[in-house]
Amino acid sequence: MRTKLDGRIRTQIENGVASGHRSMFAVVGDKARDQVPILYHILSKSTVSARPNVLWCYKKELSFSTHRAKKAKKMKKATTTISGSLPDADPFDVFISSTQIRYCYYNETEKILGNTFGVLVLQDFEAMTPNLLARTIETIEGGGMVILLMQSVRSLRQLYTISMDVHNRYRTEAHNEITARFNERFILSLASCSSVLVLDDQLRVLPISSHIENVEAIPASQKKIQSESDAELASLKEAMKETKPIGPLLSRARTACQAKALLRFLDVITEKQSNVTCSLTAGRGRGKSAAVGLSLAGAIAFGYTNIFVTSPSPENLKTLFEFVVKGFDALDYQEHTDYELIQSANPEFKNCLVRINVFREHKQTIQYISPTDVQKLGQCELIVIDEAAAIPLPLVKELISGPYISFLSSTINGYEGTGRSLSLKLLQQLRQQSAGGEAKEGKSASNKGKTLHEMHMEESIRYKPGDKIEKWLNRLLCLDATNCQLKLECGTPPPAACELYIVNRDTLFSFHDASEAFLQQVMAIFVSAHYKNSPNDLQMLSDAPAHNLFVLMAPIDKSRKTIPEVLAVVQVCLEGRLDSDNIQNGLESGKRAAGDLLPWTVSQQFMDKQFGTLCGGRIVRVAVHPDYQSMGYGGRAVQLIEQYYLGLATSLDEEEKAPAPPSKTVIKQVKDGHTVELLEERIEPRADLPPLLQRLDERKPERLDYLGVSFGLTVPLLKFWKRNEFVPVYIRQNSNDITGEHTCIILKGLEHGGSDSDEEPSATWLPVYWREFRRRIVNLLSFDFSSFPAQMALSLLQLKNKHVEKQMKRLVIERSELAIHLSNTDLRRMSQYGRNMVDSHIITDILPIVAKLNFEQRLPQELKLAVTQSAILLARGLQHKHFEDISKELDLPMNQIFALLTKAIRRIGDWFDEVCETAVRENLDKEAEASAANKPTSSLPKAVPLANLEDELESAAKEIRARHDRDRKALLAELGNELQKYEIIQDEKELAEAYESVNMKYANKLVSVKSKRTAIQAAIPDAKDPANKNAKKKKRFSSGGRR
């Protein structure tokens, strides 16, 4: 039975083709698939170009055969019957066999990036996610259409409660009731767009689309009106028409934004300065890859020899290489004659282009490389990084650090969750380097001071400006949050005066005008303050039962009737309360359920199944308004959340309120017996909604045992959380593929009832976790964490939680344990180095041991080192960095590095010596006591000292002095008899006579005086006596005989 088609459908499609805008049709019913050929036929008749190609996305099964050969054979077999008549072929089979259709699984839609289609068909509504919507709809060109196939329902309100596949990820053991707020908002949004028609499976317009009761066709006169952008593009092409090779390349540009970007690229190429970086950012489908591809063709024309292109996958470079070839066509290059195309032999890349060899004038190459192949850029002259936001930031920094021109292109708006990292981190560092400043991290001598050219493209390449589907999608998924006005009029109130409110998610996602404005403001703060965002986060925030949203606001002026201004937004997820048996089974099997990130991770790392039974709150993100960052508002929000879950925010003036049940959306269930026909149903936002904001003292909180955070480890974030007394317990050894950061988990125990209460969660498990974490980090700093800045590593090992510090006992090392780590020779080497008697390489092997003992707090508190000394000891002893690297990192000269290390080693070495001396003294005392105890007992009384030590020493000194006097006198007496024989015995009278008889002027200073010898002198024989001489001679001859 044939029915007349609603004229609004045809008019809608024709208007889209005429204006270059897209149309969308949501078809509800079991036979919705059969209406696709009809809509496609209308579109193909309305266009003057070739039949549009189709992208058909589905979950698992298509429910029909896609084999074109079998379809053609079946149709040929059925063309004739026995009677010879020609039956009517199935329109759907004709459509499948005669149309260029690309079938794609939902989980493989990333492979369609950069492609353009005329028609999009989305089936399996329950498997769709916000990411899929944004990713697929943006591939449709202007004049095309999106067909959304929905299952048969009695009422559109049944779609509110439909179970989506993604909801399985949101369910946890403690929170398993899902409220599909996103579906309700999605259905309501369809009625807000004039380019969306909701139809049944007979192509009848449903009342939800009553806002477009009369669709007027676009007059022919308006179709020929040229926009300002088109006029600007035409003038640019005309101005550069005679300039080669720029003119022919510019003729391929489709928009004015693309033409300006291409001109900037070509200007940089013609200047041939190797210290230039160009950044091109835009939303999805703005023609970035096309502009880069045309610029590469221009680089070949200007004589560049070695050009490299990189991307997360070669499949993403299809459009880029396509426009390189189009650029060659514009420059009259002939394939096989002037250049050749090389496809990849890797089956994973599916015959993608990976190389273009040009040999028109000399050998030139455009080569694809993997982002990890930085070592292949030795002879590079120009490198292009397409979709740079999807490549880890450390790799991007390394790729652009060489002495060559760098082109970056990336999508910063749209569905990509990583696009903001390019603008928030990398481009900020490049701006600092371009301005002559030094980047905070990732500083390199080769890219320091590079000139940066930033370009941004606004106009879409696939459709004309003013596309209503784009506006609808941006509003639904908050994709244009970066363009939201964030200027606040509340000034800068003191953080202590600000208040925290909990947001009612039923009202927030109700699609009311006021709540939509508030939602856009919240998402704008999320996007501008946090670099990792995606539309899927929006669905998680709306539907996940364990998530709560808090906003920090300035004191509200009740006289104003505007939307409250938000200073900070905090998203909290409740986790834990797991069954211990489930945890044990998960730990043994290595599998875990979705959700509950902190309980599962901590339980697995510490092999503690009891931790998962606790109830905790994970702070998913803290986002502060970009104009109010680093002013204390983020810390104030965290402080208020802690007080809220401790029960300190509850009003004392009111009676105790019952615990607030989880927020639920009240949706009227539509049963078969009480259904409303689709053609009579009108869908509108609900009116019976609670207030959007609720004070904390109006809602009794859940009882939590801890608060936790999982974040990408950076120095500023670590300082922020430690300032709020959070304790790190886990760091992932593998870095994040996108940001290059290591995931860190930090916890803070909530002590209900104060420190005197018997319930002190942090008193039982958190100190144990911290001690174990500290021990692991000390050992891992020489492995996966050796690249950490010394400042970050030192901050990880410093505890700032007062409750945990009170329970931490410092286990000072003893002599017996010290001997296991350090020998006596090691201690002597330390002592010598501390006194500058040996070089530093003498103690290189000792530094890891000393550093480990220091940072594991095995040394006494009074031996605490200065911060700089600790950083040097950590960097050298634990991370094994070279002194040159330490000097650059700490910005200290080498002599100060050595001096500070020497002082630290001397202090520690002196304490080690003191420990050894004390141990020796104690051993001697013990031996003396043991020897005294082992002596046999006697009848004599026990000896008692008669005097103290000083008296004994004085007595001994007197005895020694007396002995010395006695020995001296004996020596003088012995020598005196021998010396008397040389004594001159004369009186003064004889001497005076001698002096008078001699003239002293001419004397030779000798005076002779006659004297008489004493008896002793007479006994001595005179050697001059002849008798004595003869006696000596006789004695000689008698002994020797004659000769």
Curated annotation (Swiss-Prot):
Biased composition (Basic residues): 1030-1043
A cellular component annotation (GO) from this entry: nucleolus
InterPro entries on file: GNAT_dom, NAT10, NAT10/TcmA_helicase, P-loop_NTPase, TmcA/NAT10/Kre33, TmcA_N, tRNA_bind_dom
Alphabetic keyword roster: Acyltransferase, ATP-binding, Nucleotide-binding, Nucleus, rRNA processing, Transferase, tRNA processing
Cell compartment(s), UniProt: Nucleus, Nucleolus
Domain of life: Eukaryota
Primary residence: nucleus
Location of the region described as Disordered in the Swiss-Prot/TrEMBL record: 1020-1043
Binding, acetyl-CoA: 622-624, 629-635, 723
One Pfam family named in its UniProt record: GNAT_acetyltr_2
Enzyme class: transferase
Residue sites binding ATP per the record: 285-294, 462
Annotated ranges, domain N-acetyltransferase: 551-736
EC number: 2.3.1.-
Protein's job: RNA cytidine acetyltransferase with specificity toward both 18S rRNA and tRNAs. Catalyzes the formation of N(4)-acetylcytidine (ac4C) in 18S rRNA. Required for early nucleolar cleavages of precursor rRNA at sites A0, A1 and A2 during 18S rRNA synthesis. Catalyzes the formation of ac4C in serine and leucine tRNAs. Requires a tRNA-binding adapter protein for full tRNA acetyltransferase activity but not for 18S rRNA acetylation. Part of the small subunit (SSU) processome, first precursor of the small eukaryotic ribosomal subunit.
Subunit structure, as described in the record: Part of the small subunit (SSU) processome, composed of more than 70 proteins and the RNA chaperone small nucleolar RNA (snoRNA) U3.
Similarity comment: Belongs to the RNA cytidine acetyltransferase family. NAT10 subfamily.
Protein's recorded name: RNA cytidine acetyltransferase
Species of origin: Caenorhabditis elegans
